[in-house]
Amino acid sequence: MSRPKICASIVNDDLEAIKGVAPLVDLYEVRIDLIGFEWRELTGQLPKPWIACNRKPEEGGMWPGGERERIAELLAALELGAEIIDVELSTQGLADILARVKKRAKCLISYHDMKETPSIDVMKEIMQRQLAAGADICKVVTTAQKFEDNVSTLQLIREFPENRVVSFAMGPLGLISRVLCPLVGGEFIYAAIAAGQEAASGQITANELRKIYSMVRE
């Protein structure tokens, strides 16, 4: 089994901690909405490829400005060397944004349900919309209200074996889906750089995840 990929979510400008987890992770997620305007300087010092993300409040983000400014700040990452740009499926003008992104980077189209986990049929329809829009990577993240929600998000990955998918459930009840996502075929899983620096509810640290994966491989 190949080494499960971990993406470390950067939520502040603690460069020492960011570089400290580099041996454990495969890429970084730069959370522009959480870091603030210092994010630009930080990206030039990252030792691994990175995803640019400027999450909208409706999907769990903290961007304080307007939508036009949010997208402009996100697309600035193209000039700074982002390998992947995360754009929400619900973003207005998605086609035009993707056309700009695809000239320079891969596009991850994301969907977040902050309240519950839809049925597998609804999640499959969301995935189809992401693929039809031109996603290089599809991300479908829900909120676990019961243990079975973990199974649904992981099943979604198995339903699309030819595509690059990230799917898991947030919250305390969704922990197992985070761990298992890359083990059942998910493209990667997000992790916190350190305890207390979680980008979303239920996020595990990169160190904890790598310890688990090393035991699985033994």
Label each region the model flagged.
Residues 158-218:
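C-terminal alpha-helical cap/extension of soluble enzyme domains
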Residues 33-48, 89-104, 118-122, 145-158, ...:
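Active-site-adjacent beta->alpha loops and helix N-cap segments on the catalytic face
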Residues 9-11, 27-37, 74-76, 80-94, ...:
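Catalytic beta/alpha-barrel core
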Residues 60-63, 117-122, 198-204:
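Short, charged, surface-exposed secondary-structure boundary motifs
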Residues 24-27, 47-49, 79-83, 100-109, ...:
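Glycine-enriched alpha-helix->loop->beta-strand junction motifs that scaffold or abut catalytic
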Residues 122-130:
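Anionic-ligand binding region
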Residues 1-71, 79:
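Conserved N-terminal beta1-alpha1 strand-loop-helix module at the mouth
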